[in-house]
Amino acid sequence: MYAIVKTGGKQYKVAEGDFVKVEKIEGEPGSSVALTPILLVDGADVTTKAADLAKVSVTAEIVEAVKGPKIKILKYKNKTGYKKRQGHRQQLTVLKITGIK
């Protein structure tokens, strides 16, 4: 059984026992969170109706908070000597899917 959930502006296909890296979610490692909205559930049959999806819940446990890879940004203007370097590391949360009910 799997579900498609939306969190942090992205959609993830999750099944029970999966580890997923998502955009930062507030909470301590070891705490439980409910992932909403649920867009699709596939068990014995595929469910996409909003009334049926309202009865389904996806729960996950926060494993750890990590940072993504460094993204390098360089601005450059020709003939003027203007260069600007910048970097960024996105904050991520690792979740373990504990149940789809």
Curated annotation (Swiss-Prot):
Keyword hit for rRNA-binding: yes
What this protein is reported to do is described as:
This protein binds to 23S rRNA in the presence of protein L20.
- PROSITE patterns linked to this entry: RIBOSOMAL_L21 (PS01169)
Q: Which GO terms describe its molecular function?
A: rRNA binding; structural constituent of ribosome
Q: What is this protein's record name?
A: Large ribosomal subunit protein bL21
One Pfam entry name: Ribosomal_L21p
Family that this chain belongs to: Belongs to the bacterial ribosomal protein bL21 family.
Q: Which InterPro entries match?
A: bL21-like, bL21-like_sf, Ribosomal_bL21, Ribosomal_bL21_CS
| UniProt-listed GO biological process terms | translation
Organism of this sequence: Corynebacterium diphtheriae (strain ATCC 700971 / NCTC 13129 / Biotype gravis)
Q: Name one GO cellular component term.
A: cytoplasm
> PANTHER family from the entry?
50S RIBOSOMAL PROTEIN L21, LARGE RIBOSOMAL SUBUNIT PROTEIN BL21M
Superkingdom of the source species: Bacteria
Question: What is the protein's quaternary organization?
Answer: Part of the 50S ribosomal subunit. Contacts protein L20.
Sorted UniProt keywords = Ribonucleoprotein, Ribosomal protein, RNA-binding, rRNA-binding
